């Protein structure tokens, strides 16, 4: 996934350079200015996602390697688990166990919410109830804090990925607007100074996308990439 994001980042940067080149000759074009702003935002979001992935993976592996579960769990067991929404402990049932990653899919008895949580965070029902009664408002343990922090980072990354998806859609809308503007300008201009959208898709699989009228020579065009396959789940940290 990091490799995919890196490729996307390179593509966004190349597109930004082309838009900036187009703006050098048409600096007041609102569509180009909006596209430049969107590209700058999506570049920053993609950088954030790339920077958070290695640290989360490392934190996950370190915490799992240093703390193995002391209880032998099996599917169908009742347990006490921390709900990520409020950090409180509730009774749950184990639906599935992933021994390789040290996690369990559980369903909370009260609300019926399903969640995946580290096995090391699960406690036997009686032990968990007693700990909950004794602790009162006692701060969460280090293990619980790590689990909660990981969940928070995943949710934050999901929001960033969703924003990238929204920006991709906005760019498609901007492409349509540019094409409409292009057609109107060409119909009024007999000399045909504006003939083709800088956002136009290639006419063949070997075609390229780029600014042909930017006045920059000897610079390669950006390879056309279909970004529709990159959805939110592709961008989420593992």
Curated annotation (Swiss-Prot):
Main location: nucleus
InterPro entries: SMN_Tudor, Tudor
GO cellular component, one term: cytoplasm
Location within or outside the cell: Nucleus speckle; Nucleus, Cajal body
N6-acetyllysine sites (modified residues): 219
Biological process per Gene Ontology, one example term: RNA splicing
Domain Tudor, residue spans: 72-132
Subunit (UniProt): Associates with spliceosomes. Associates with U4/U5/U6 tri-snRNP and with U2 snRNP.
Function: Involved in spliceosome assembly.
Similarity remark: Belongs to the SMN family.
Protein name: Survival of motor neuron-related-splicing factor 30
Organism: Mus musculus (Mouse)
